[in-house]
Amino acid sequence: MDWTTPAQRPAPHGLRATMARAARALAGCALAVGTVAALAPPVQAQAQAQTQAQDSSIVLRGKDGWLFPGWGSLTQVDRAGITESTRLLTEARNLLAARGVKLQVLLLPDKVRFYSDKMPEGKAMSAEVQGRYKQVLQALQAAGIPSFDDEAVLRTVRDSAKDVFYRTDQHWTQAAADATAEATARMVLTEVPQLAGRAGSGMALGDTVTERRYGDLAELFLTADERKQVGREVYTVRRQAQAQGQGLLDDEPAPVHVTGHSMVQPYFGFPQKLSNLLDRPVSLNWKPGNVGQWAMLLEYLESPAFKAHRPQVLVWQMFEPTYSYGPNAAGQWDNASLMPNATWLERLRAALKG
């Protein structure tokens, strides 16, 4: 795997200018997954001092030391935003299809869905928000955009007595990432049974190791005393297996590309598992969630990598609570990522013309 930067620990979704600066410091670059390189250890959070004084609403402090990100509404669903985002996705799907690329959406559910019993007193999803994930899936289905019910996938993991999110982190566990990679592989192969490339070019999976530390929500948003109260937790990550014949695979094009935020970064294992299951290289570009899904797609489509090689399948990872936020969602995305919907469409069309 020819990773241009080591795998990093992410910054959380940025709702404030300080978090935007932190996110830029921790941002990942375009990575090629499925060809070689070892998984690097996580980077220590670089914005701790800046963010400790942030509004406590950014993080919800639940029971038994559980922390929840606070950047999605627990009471209201932006139906108009869901409709508009789906319209933009449909435009992207059509333009990509005209260039021989199939667009699929990986919609990740909110952490709160799986640990409602750990939420603070008086904090809970309203009945309307409980139906939000299904509403987005139905909108994608009505638009003819392939996706799958990852909430159901992760509930199966949870029902097997495994955690799907870390207690003090916004991110998922390896068990959750692996299960989602399996469902994603099925989605890819259902639509494209014959992927280009050579059998045996997928990533070999290494052994798992554990490390004890604070989750990102604790590291970035709690004071030193508050962190001591919630405590560290054990992370399970998979080491990169030693590749065989590495030099032969370095330039092998990937038939599948994933674009998204820090949930799909290599540290948590999703792209490696997907590559292993598909038995093909998988390429990836990701940045922390404050950059937003709209800027991430453009980053890839406007890149030399896309111009040099168009994948057969583009998996666009999105997050349920932020699906309704469009390209111009001020206060949600990094200022550098903001643009009117019309500008986003213009850049999309320019990247995919010819």
Language-model regions, residue ranges each:
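Extracellular glycan-modifying ectodomains
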Residues: 2-6, 14-29, 35, 39-354
